[in-house]
Amino acid sequence: MTSVLIVEDEESLADPLAFLLRKEGFEATVVTDGPAALAEFDRAGADIVLLDLMLPGMSGTDVCKQLRARSSVPVIMVTARDSEIDKVVGLELGADDYVTKPYSARELIARIRAVLRRGGDDDSEMSDGVLESGPVRMDVERHVVSVNGDTITLPLKEFDLLEYLMRNSGRVLTRGQLIDRVWGADYVGDTKTLDVHVKRLRSKIEADPANPVHLVTVRGLGYKLEG
């Protein structure tokens, strides 16, 4: 059974959502603050985390940082704040999606399913083998990436994005192609999400992220991974 960890201090939102998730066949656990979320994750794990940005005490961004240090578990940020900077910060920390309150519980469950589908894609074209491009080596089956022999940690979306780029090394991929492949054709949003993930990837695979030579921008088109 797919487990969902709900980190939300508003019981009026968390409890009905947990009830609906259970009706839909998920295992749902609710915690109301950051330390409890980390303790529960360490105790039982989770297949996906719904994380409120505005938590009492330890913020959602700090919780996301701690989760990313532990795991590549998918994270959907949930918040009442609709500021673009909030979204960018959440995505830079490794969140896989971002939902603004008030939201439809059914819509949120659809997003959960979409994120889990993308994370569990078993298409053989995109799921097996060892890929190499320049200093980057990816073992797709083991979900391990190394740069110049040093292992790096990538959240799920960064891993998926890098895998698609590596499978198309030397080829220009448009922003639309990348978003459709990594976030899905039902993704609603702009290209800033992609650009944030590219920036994060560059910080991990480039010797000088400000002057990339491997993951390069093709002006007016998209991105290309050079071998």
Swiss-Prot record:
One of its GO terms (molecular function) is DNA binding. Disruption phenotype: The senX3-regX3 deletion mutant shows a growth defect after infection of macrophages and is attenuated in both immunodeficient and immunocompetent mice. Deletion of the gene leads to differential regulation of a set of genes involved in, among others, cell wall and cell processes, intermediary metabolism, respiration, virulence and transcriptional regulation. Deletion mutant is attenuated in terms of its ability to withstand hypoxia. Residues 128-227 bind DNA. Keywords: DNA-binding, Phosphoprotein, Stress response, Transcription, Transcription regulation, Two-component regulatory system, Virulence. One of its GO terms (biological process) is regulation of phosphate metabolic process. The keyword Transferase does not apply. Phosphorylated by SenX3. Phosphorylated and inhibited by PknB. Induction: Part of the senX3-regX3 operon. The two genes are separated by a rather long intercistronic region composed of a class of duplicated sequences named mycobacterial interspersed repetitive units (MIRUs). Significantly up-regulated after 28 days of hypoxia. Changing T29E: Does not affect phosphorylation by PknB. Does not affect transcriptional activity. Residues 3-116 form the Response regulatory domain. Member of the two-component regulatory system SenX3/RegX3 involved in stress response. The system is involved in phosphate starvation response. Plays a role in modulating expression of aerobic response and in the regulation of response to hypoxia. Involved in virulence. Regulates dozens of genes, directly or indirectly. Is directly involved in the regulation of the expression of gltA, cydAB and ald. Binds to the upstream regions of the hypoxia-associated genes Rv3334, whiB7, Rv0195, Rv0196 and Rv1960c. This is Sensory transduction protein RegX3. It comes from Mycobacterium tuberculosis (strain ATCC 25618 / H37Rv). The lineage of its organism: Bacteria, Bacillati, Actinomycetota, Actinomycetes, Mycobacteriales.
